[in-house]
């Protein structure tokens, strides 16, 4: 029995990733931690030299890494070869407090909507047997990953932002980014598997969708979670709790340690931004574009009069394909700003440019917009399903209105009741006719 192409693709992808660069979301989901530390992107350039020396600039904060060598004086530097520091910014960026309030409000909104939406989505798929098919199980896997991120990471990040400290210890410092990266990996790989599954469903017109979880879909989900966890391991290794001296007080900061012990982790830290952009952003968009193009060509190639009996079945598959495309589109829009800010930092930022301060302010604002947009992705998938899919919309209404019975069960119950009423009326009419016959005779 030949495995489906989607499983083969995921297995090949897992092998390449495990043997190659086992990297994961380094900065994207933990980025709310950057503004929590007092030295900000623009403000750090007007700090005193003693403060700069104590602050580990080459960290996982929202500072361009390229600015670290020029900004931090090295103790081992010879006196005869001084290194000129770039001119400081005239004024700091005044966005820190504003970001605190905005990020707290957005995080609370994501927390409430995400728990309600994702838990409702999981309950719908669990309670309704007719909803337990391959695509919906992949959607449930995606919702479970988002739910883990919402419950564990968002409250810790909000507290860290408001308290400007990390009181949770070194173990949680490694666990929180690990869960964050695994959650993003589950989202990316689930969207790739959904796109491949939709092409297979449309290409095999005669394959009737059944109720239940296909065996290969279950294997795909296990593979998705295993690969996501493997890719998150470097974050648990690289992150550490660092104590810095800032204005006479000691702050504990959870960050990717600037000095990694192994050569692989040094390479991991250096190539992180490009890896994040290519795998965690471009890959799902490229796979969706490729397989949806093939799916469109396949649909146009089929004759219009072919298999008329399957018209309703094909309409359902097209609706599911539209739903998956909507999920991928929402993912791309939510993560575009944050990835754009990372790439601009790598390509445009010059530490010796006298006009770099304006670019720093722009990148900082773009970072903050991207942080909040990326946070919305954890709660927006159930909303997108509600707006796009009629079946999910009816199930959401049924579940959120606290109706214990599922939508399909209620619909079948109403049909049974109407049939019973019709039979009862028909039986009464037959009795009436027989009684009339009796009386007339």
Swiss-Prot record:
SMART domains given in the database record: 7TM_GPCR_Srsx
Gene Ontology molecular functions: endothelin receptor activity
Keyword Ribosomal protein: no
Lipidation (S-palmitoyl cysteine): 402, 404
Glycosylation sites: 60
PANTHER family noted in UniProt: ENDOTHELIN RECEPTOR TYPE B (PTHR46099:SF3), G_PROTEIN_RECEP_F1_2 DOMAIN-CONTAINING PROTEIN (PTHR46099)
Disulfide bonds: 173-254
Compartment(s) of residence: Cell membrane
Family indicated by similarity: Belongs to the G-protein coupled receptor 1 family. Endothelin receptor subfamily. EDNRB sub-subfamily.
Residues in compartment: Cytoplasmic: 126-136, 197-217, 296-323, 389-441
Main location class: membrane
Residues with the Phosphotyrosine modification: 438
Protein name (database record): Endothelin receptor type B
Chain ranges on the Extracellular side, renumbered to this chain: 27-100, 163-174, 243-270, 350-361
Lineage top rank: taxon: Eukaryota
Residues where Phosphoserine is found: 304, 418, 439-441
């Amino acid at each position: 029995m030949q495995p489906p192409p989607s499983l083969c693709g995921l297995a090949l992808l897992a092998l390449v990733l495990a043997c190659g660069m086992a990297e994961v979301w380094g900065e994207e989901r933990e980025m709310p931690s950057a503004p929590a530390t007092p030295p900000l992107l623009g403000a750090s350039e007007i700090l005193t030299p003693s403060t700069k020396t104590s602050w580990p600039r080459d960290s996982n904060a929202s500072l361009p890494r390229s600015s670290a060598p020029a900004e931090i004086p090295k103790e081992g530097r010879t006196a005869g070869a001084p290194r000129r520091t770039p001119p400081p910014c005239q004024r700091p960026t005044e966005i820190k407090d504003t970001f605190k309030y905005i990020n707290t409000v957005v995080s609370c909104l994501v927390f409430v909507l995400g728990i309600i939406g994702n838990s409702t989505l999981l309950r719908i798929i669990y309670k309704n047997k007719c909803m337990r098919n391959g695509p919906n199980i992949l959607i449930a896997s995606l919702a479970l990953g988002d739910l883990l991120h919402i419950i564990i990471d968002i409250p810790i990040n909000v507290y860290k932002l408001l308290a400007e400290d990390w009181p949770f210890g070194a173990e949680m410092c490694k666990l929180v980014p690990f869960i964050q990266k695994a959650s993003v990996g589950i989202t990316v790989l689930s969207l790739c598997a959904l796109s491949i599954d939709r092409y297979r469903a449309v290409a095999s017109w005669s394959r009737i969708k059944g109720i239940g979880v296909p065996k290969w879909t279950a294997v795909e989900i296990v593979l998705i979670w295993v690969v996501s966890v493997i890719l998150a391991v470097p974050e648990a290794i690289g992150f550490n709790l660092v104590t810095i001296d800032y204005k006479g007080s000691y702050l504990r900061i959870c960050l990717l340690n600037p000095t990694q012990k192994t050569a692989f982790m040094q390479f991991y830290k250096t190539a992180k931004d490009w890896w994040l952009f290519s795998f965690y952003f471009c890959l799902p968009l490229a796979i969706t574009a490729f397989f949806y193009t093939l799916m469109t060509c396949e649909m146009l190639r089929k004759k219009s009069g072919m298999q008329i009996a399957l018209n309703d079945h094909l309409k359902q598959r097209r609706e599911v394909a539209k739903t998956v495309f909507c999920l991928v589109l929402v993912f791309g829009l939510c993560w575009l700003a944050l990835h754009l800010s990372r790439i601009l930092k790598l390509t445009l930022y010059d530490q010796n440019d006298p006009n770099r301060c304006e670019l720093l302010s722009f990148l900082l604002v773009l970072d903050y917009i991207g942080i909040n947009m990326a946070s919305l992705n954890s709660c927006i998938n159930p909303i997108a399903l509600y707006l796009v899919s009629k079946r999910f919309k009816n199930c959401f209404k049924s579940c959120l209105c606290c109706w214990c019975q599922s939508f399909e069960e209620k619909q079948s119950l109403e049909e049974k009741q109407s049939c019973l009423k019709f039979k009862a009326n028909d039986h009464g009419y037959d009795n009436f006719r027989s009684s009339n016959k009796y009386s007339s005779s």
